[in-house]
Structures are given as structure tokens and as C-alpha cells.
């Protein structure tokens, strides 16, 4: 980062020289220039009435919730119990939430009374990284507001068909690096429509669509975010008729490396009003959007086949449009399949209107073009790392076309190249161009992307009502009630589970759960068995039940029991809460006051019992729910595998023990292989999400123990969509520097916007944190060598 340090030095020298040589009069003149009037605010590109509530959509089932203090709990319970095709209607009012709302069922509609009438307030949220998390296909959210979420406002992941309309997401304290990262955040989803919505205060992007396809973003108001709208690593998007004003930057189209989905292309940005995006960048350090200077209208980074037309882009002091390679970030590219250069842009028939005045915001990227263009940057700036735009009517493949764009005086705009490919530098090591201009307007013709066609909304698949299944819970027989496995029984005792009828086991390295002791038991139907697998969970027959009871180690009282039941339709998780010796189904989750004595010290906290939908957050691999601990590598200790085989409960076990996968015990201090212990700990605690099929795979960080160490496993990996979770740090793991590593930071935090794991973490595992710290500090190499 020598160039960044040089830029900071030249900024300081220039400011000092201005004060010493020009004096107070020049300083006053500079302040006057900064304050002078801009061009007037234009009209919005849509009618205000579009944001008003509309008639509710047709639905197969409807749940109307009444206003009360416990609405958050009743809403989560309603979402869990809803059948596909259900409309859930929220009342007018402001309601507090201390946990995220997860929607797993497909074909659910969540509707309020209006974006300024129904408000879900997440100011005091203690668990979960977003306000609302949508994981079910065909999700519709409308006519409500989500405010003050510590992480993202509304996030969806891996779903097909999303409609968000007339929805408001806001951080009510105004622009701040302490705000959540994204307002509306679909990722790895398709057939997305976001319309007539408002987002303000996001510390990354107001509307952010990542790693997705078939996207329409229209008629939205995005103000006072870092980026108003960002389309990242996505294909086939239409962004039009939006009002993007008073952000740091209006609209971004980016493509980044080291992600599961890359190669962004075919985005159309048209008929938007992009106005006065001059708010100082307030993104937490370490996030890629933090490099974007204020005074930026539009920016394209490393994306291909982008068409930008019909936009009014007014009052931007840095540039109306910036087109750059990812290389300008100075972050090393370690992804061999990633193409860092933008190609084949067609920018035409836009109005780029900027006043003739200086604009300095104090950022590195704002200073550089001012130096190269003698304090008079053109409307369009390209980095010049490659020959990116036409200089004649006939163009080479991959070049971009800038044609028929006008400035504030209805004249032709200027296109300027910073000519970074020249390699020329000045005495301070800064790029010195020389800057190049492409003044003439060639009548070039670019490639137009197709209009986005959203697929037909799917019909809901009908399911059996739960009250019909509850009859299965009633039995007078002794032993396990096998007929009840298809029902969510209200009482744990309805299943007839006793430890003597199953096999009790432990894991080589267990997942940390606030120091709770765990009692694990597996039950198999008669004449059935598990089948060995070298990777992933053992193959379990239909009817398998896994019971895990969490016990306070000090009081020795059971707090909760979680069941995993393998039904005909797949695995399902059920949480049961203990009270006075009876365990009852509690699908909505709970916070339970607990106390333990740890190393002679009393610790008090609220233990989180997850709601039923939160089971999916850890156990879902793609669309398939799976057990985590029921895998050979975790069971392979204390002769457990052999005992299961001898019992007739495990088949296909390799005779040679050396052929059975084995991981280290994280707390085995007699094992001198520190990396094995640390990576086993990360695998069981983080790897169920951080793997190519887990919920966190969109981050590009994989933490399975068997993977070779690389950027993908965190070494010198920049954060993606981390928000405050980046902690002003640059990489997940910095060899030799645990305190500079995002991984260590997040493990040691209880802040819901930062902590990892996100769920069921009320205490920091100090012993596990110390293990990871020791491992990172002994790791060879540096990130600078990249």
C-alpha cells in the first residue's frame, strides 16, 4: 500500500503549502468554492403515489396479527407455522425485535399497512446478522419498514422469485459507520424485483444485489447511503427510474474476485436520476466500497457488457461516471479465473451535468484525478490500465463506446483517461499519467443488453395441516412412538425417547454452545442401520431421530432439547424448552437467563434457544437439511464407530482404521499439531456455514479442515459484504497477526453485527479464541508478499 501512503503524504503537503503560501484569503476562497450553489435539484423519475399501499394480493391462507408488545414472537411463530401460499398481515404500529425474523417456507407474503405505518424496530437486536432473512422461494414483502438493524435490513439467499415493494429500510441516526451494511440485499437469488421502496443510512449499499440473475430494480428512492444501488457479480439486471441522491456514490456495477459467482455482465442502467451524491464515505474500513470517493455519480468496476443510457447525472464533483479495473484497489488478485478489467460498455444519450468548480473530499481516489486533470476532472474518467474505449468509429473487441452524451450546457462531454498503464510516477511515487482526453464524440455503436424478463411467479404447493398430524402424537404404547416422527409433537415425551433405547455418543471436537454440556443420543427404527460415508453425514434411514439436550454445567439442569428427525420429506429440526422437568415444543425461540461458575467466577447471561427456522441456518446445505455432527470424522474416537458396527447400527465401515477420516481434538494439548487442532475447531464451529453449500458460501470463505490453506480458507482474503464485521481490518487471516485478522475479531465479539457464529452465541469461548490466536500468530508468511 505504498501508493496509498504516498497519496496521504501528498495530501498533507498540498494542504500545508496552500495554507503557508496562499494564506488566509485563499483558505476563505476555497471554503467559498466548496459552498457555492450546485445546479438545482431535478424532479424524481416517478410519481410519489407509487409508494402508497395497494390492495393485498390473493392468497390461499391468511393470518392477521394484532398489535401487542409480543408481536415479534407471534410473527416468528406465524412464519414457522405458515403453509405455502400464506399471507401474513401486520398491523399499524412500531414493534421491537430482539432477534432476526427468518422466513423459510416458500410462497409467503409479509404485508404491513404502509412503509411509514408498520415499523419493525431492530435497535435492540441481540441475535442474527439481519432484520429479516428470507430463505424460501417466491417471497413477497410489502408495505412495511425495517429500521436500525445491526447488520443488513432485509436479506434473501438462494431463492427463486423475490418481490419487495413499497418497503422502507432505514438507520434513523443518519449516515454512520456503525449502521448495518445493506438495506435490501438479495444474494445468489434469481427473478428479483425491488420496486417503489426507500432505503437510507446503509454503511455499504442501500440496495445491493449480489451473485444473482434476472434482476429488476426500479422506482426506488435511495438516499444517504454509501452506495445508493449496487449490482455486484450478477448477470441480467435492469436498474431504471430510480432516484439516487445524497449518497457517497449513486449507482455501482462491480465484479469482485474470490467469490462463488463472478463474471458480472449484461446490466442496463437507464432513466435514473442520480443527483448530488456528495455524502462523505462512511463505510467501515476494510470494505471495498470504502475506496469510492464522494461526488461519484456512477461507477463500473471490472464488469462487462454494461449499457448506461437516458440517465440524468447531476452535481458530482469527482466524476459523473468512473470506469475502472479492480486493479485500482491495489488488492492482490489471487483468483486465477477472475478477469479484473471492464469491457464492452455502451454509454449513450445521458446528461452528465456538473458545475464548473473544484471538488475535494479528502479521499485518495478523489485526490488522484484532481492532480492528473489539473483540478478539472472530466465527466467520464477511465483508469487507463487498458485501452478501454473507442478512439474511432471502428473499435476493437472489448472496447467501450461513449457516444451522444451531453453536459450541463448541452455540449459534448469529456472522457479522460488517467493513463495508469504508463507506469509514470512523480517524485513521491504517485501516478503521473500524463492524463489523456478523448474530446471528440465518435458515432460509435455499442452492444445493447436485452430487456430483463422475470419468470412466471410459481403457484404454492399444498401441504397437510399440522393439526391433522398431531393425532400421531397420541399413543399408549411403550417405547418409542415411531408413528409420531411425521408430526411436530407439542411435548418431547410424546416421542417416547429414553437413552437406553438409543446410542449415546460424543464428538471428537464439539461445537461450542455457551459452555453448555450436551447429551447426544441417536435412535434408529427396528431392523435399520446407518451407512458409512467418508465425507458428509452418515446415511441415515427414514425414521432416525437425533436428540441433543443442553445442560447447564453448574446447576445440572436441562435447558433445551433439540430433535433432528429424518422424515419422508427430509430432515427437520424441533426445539423443546425445559421447565419444571417438562419439555415443550417452542418453535418461536427464547432467551433464558442463565448463570455458570467458570474458573471460580460467576457469569450471568441470556442463553438463546433458536427458533425452528434458525435450525436451517446451520443445517441447510443448499436446499437439503443435514445433521452436522453425525459424520465419520467427528465420531471417530473412543471406539464409537466400532461400537455402532458391533451393535448392528453401522454398515460399510472400512476394516482398516487408517482409512476412516479423523480430525484432531481441539483441546488435546498433547497433540503438537496446532494447525490441526485449530482447523478442527473452525470446521465444527464455522464450517457448516462456510463451505460451498452452506449459508455463508456467498462470502467465498471456506473453513472445512480438509481444505488446503489458501485465500479461499481465509489467508489474506479481503472481506466481502462484511459491513462492520470487517472491523476496519483488511483480511480474514493475516499470518503472524491475530489482532489484525477479521476471523479473530469476529470470534471475540458479541456485537450482533460482528460476532461469529451469528446464532446461539451469548458468550465468547475464551479457550477457543486463545487457540485460534495462537495458531494465527505462529502462521508463517505475510499478506504484503502478495
Please place each PLM-identified region on the residue numbering.
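Short, T/G/N/S-enriched strand-turn elements that build extracellular solenoid repeat scaffolds
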Residues: 75-81, 96-105, 110, 121, ...
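N-terminal Sec-pathway targeting helices
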Residues: 2-22
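Acidic Gly/Asp/Thr-rich repetitive segments characteristic of extracellular carbohydrate-active
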Residues: 60-89
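Right-handed parallel beta-helix
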Residues: 113-116, 137-148, 160-173, 190-205, ...
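Extracellular beta-strand/beta-solenoid scaffold signature
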Residues: 75, 98, 122-133, 148-155, ...
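Sequence context surrounding c-type heme c attachment/ligation sites in exported
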Residues: 466-474, 480, 537, 555-786
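Extracellular beta-rich repeat passengers
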Residues: 166, 241, 256, 271, ...
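Right-handed parallel beta-helix/beta-spiral solenoid domain characteristic of secreted/periplasmic
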Residues: 64-73, 107-150, 173
Amino acid at each position: 500500500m505504498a501508493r496509498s501512503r504516498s497519496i496521504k503524504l501528498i495530501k498533507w503537503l498540498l494542504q500545508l503549502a496552500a495554507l503557508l503560501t496562499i494564506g488566509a484569503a485563499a483558505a476563505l476562497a476555497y471554503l467559498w468554492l466548496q459552498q457555492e450553489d450546485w445546479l438545482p435539484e431535478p424532479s424524481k423519475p416517478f410519481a410519489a403515489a407509487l409508494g402508497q399501499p395497494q390492495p393485498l394480493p390473493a392468497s390461499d391462507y391468511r393470518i392477521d396479527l394484532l398489535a401487542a408488545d409480543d408481536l415479534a414472537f407471534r410473527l416468528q411463530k406465524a412464519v414457522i407455522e405458515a403453509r405455502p401460499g400464506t399471507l401474513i398481515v401486520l398491523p399499524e404500529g412500531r414493534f421491537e425485535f430482539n432477534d432476526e425474523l427468518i422466513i423459510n417456507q416458500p410462497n409467503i407474503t409479509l404485508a404491513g399497512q404502509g412503509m411509514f405505518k408498520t415499523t419493525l424496530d431492530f435497535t435492540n437486536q441481540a441475535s442474527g446478522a439481519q432484520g429479516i432473512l428470507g430463505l424460501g422461494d417466491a417471497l413477497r414483502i410489502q408495505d412495511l419498514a425495517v429500521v436500525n438493524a445491526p447488520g443488513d435490513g432485509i436479506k434473501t439467499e438462494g431463492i427463486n422469485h423475490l418481490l419487495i415493494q413499497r418497503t422502507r429500510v432505514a438507520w434513523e441516526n443518519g449516515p454512520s459507520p456503525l449502521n448495518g451494511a445493506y438495506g435490501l440485499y438479495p444474494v445468489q437469488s434469481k427473478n428479483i424485483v425491488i420496486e417503489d421502496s426507500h432505503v437510507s443510512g446503509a454503511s455499504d449499499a442501500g440496495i445491493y444485489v449480489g451473485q444473482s440473475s434476472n434482476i429488476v430494480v426500479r422506482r426506488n428512492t435511495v438516499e444517504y447511503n454509501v452506495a445508493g444501488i449496487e449490482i455486484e457479480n450478477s448477470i441480467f439486471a435492469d436498474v431504471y427510474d430510480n432516484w439516487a441522491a445524497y449518497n457517497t456514490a449513486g449507482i455501482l456495477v462491480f465484479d469482485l474476485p474470490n467469490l462463488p459467482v463472478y463474471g458480472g455482465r449484461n446490466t442496463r442502467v437507464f432513466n435514473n436520476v442520480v443527483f448530488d451524491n456528495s455524502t462523505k464515505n462512511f463505510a467501515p474500513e476494510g470494505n471495498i466500497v470504502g475506496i469510492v470517493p464522494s461526488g461519484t455519480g456512477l461507477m463500473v468496476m471490472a464488469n462487462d457488457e454494461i449499457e448506461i443510457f437516458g440517465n440524468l447525472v447531476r452535481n458530482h464533483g469527482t466524476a459523473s461516471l468512473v470506469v475502472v479495473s479492480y486493479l485500482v484497489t491495489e488488492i492482490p488478485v489471487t483468483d486465477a479465473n477472475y478477469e479484473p478489467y471492464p469491457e464492452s460498455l455502451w454509454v449513450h444519450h445521458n446528461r452528465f451535468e456538473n458545475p464548473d468548480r473544484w471538488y475535494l473530499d479528502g479521499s485518495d481516489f478523489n485526490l488522484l484525478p484532481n492532480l492528473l486533470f489539473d483540478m478539472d476532472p472530466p465527466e467520464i474518467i477511465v483508469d487507463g490500465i487498458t485501452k478501454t474505449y473507442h478512439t474511432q468509429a471502428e473499435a476493437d473487441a472489448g472496447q467501450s463506446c461513449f457516444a451522444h452524451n451531453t453536459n450541463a450546457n448541452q455540449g459534448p462531454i469529456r472522457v479522460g483517461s488517467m493513463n495508469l498503464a504508463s507506469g509514470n510516477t512523480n517524485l513521491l511515487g504517485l501516478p503521473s499519467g500524463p492524463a489523456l482526453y478523448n474530446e471528440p464524440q465518435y458515432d460509435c455503436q455499442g452492444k445493447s443488453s436485452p430487456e430483463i424478463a422475470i419468470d412466471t411467479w410459481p403457484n404454492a404447493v399444498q401441504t397437510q395441516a399440522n393439526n391433522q398430524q398431531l393425532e400421531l402424537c397420541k399413543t399408549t404404547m411403550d417405547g418409542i412412538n415411531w408413528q409420531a416422527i411425521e408430526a411436530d409433537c407439542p411435548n418431547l415425551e410424546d416421542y417416547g425417547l429414553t437413552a437406553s433405547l438409543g446410542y449415546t455418543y460424543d464428538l471428537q471436537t464439539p461445537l461450542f454452545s455457551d459452555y453448555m454440556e450436551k447429551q447426544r443420543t441417536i435412535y434408529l427404527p427396528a431392523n435399520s442401520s446407518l451407512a458409512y460415508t467418508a465425507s458428509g453425514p452418515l446415511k441415515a434411514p427414514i425414521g432416525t431421530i437425533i436428540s441433543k439436550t443442553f445442560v447447564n454445567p453448574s446447576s445440572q439442569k436441562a435447558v433445551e432439547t433439540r430433535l433432528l428427525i429424518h422424515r419422508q420429506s427430509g430432515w427437520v429440526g424441533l426445539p423443546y424448552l425445559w421447565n419444571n422437568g417438562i419439555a415443550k415444543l417452542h418453535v418461536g425461540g427464547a432467551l433464558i437467563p442463565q448463570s455458570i461458575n467458570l474458573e471460580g467466577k460467576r457469569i450471568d447471561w441470556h442463553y438463546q434457544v433458536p427458533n425452528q427456522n434458525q435450525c436451517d441456518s446451520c443445517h441447510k446445505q443448499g436446499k437439503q437439511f443435514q445433521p452436522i455432527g453425525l459424520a465419520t470424522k467427528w465420531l471417530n474416537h473412543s471406539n464409537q464407530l466400532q461400537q455402532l458396527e458391533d451393535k448392528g447400527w453401522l454398515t460399510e465401515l472400512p476394516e482398516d482404521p487408517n482409512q476412516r477420516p479423523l480430525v484432531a481434538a481441539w483441546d488435546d494439548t498433547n497433540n503438537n499439531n496446532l494447525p490441526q487442532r485449530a482447523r478442527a475447531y473452525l470446521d465444527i464451529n464455522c464450517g457448516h456455514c462456510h463451505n460451498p453449500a452452506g449459508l455463508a458460501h456467498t462470502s467465498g470463505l471456506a473453513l472445512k479442515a480438509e481444505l488446503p490453506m489458501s485465500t479461499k480458507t481465509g489467508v489474506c482474503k479481503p472481506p466481502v459484504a462484511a459491513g462492520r464485521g470487517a472491523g476496519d481490518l483488511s483480511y480474514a487471516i493475516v499470518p503472524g497477526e491475530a489482532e489484525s485478522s477479521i476471523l479473530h475479531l469476529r470470534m471475540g465479539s458479541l456485537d450482533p453485527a460482528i460476532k461469529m457464529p451469528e446464532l446461539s452465541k451469548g458468550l465468547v469461548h475464551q479457550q477457543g479464541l486463545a487457540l485460534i490466536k495462537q495458531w494465527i500468530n505462529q502462521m508463517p508468511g505475510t499478506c504484503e508478499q502478495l
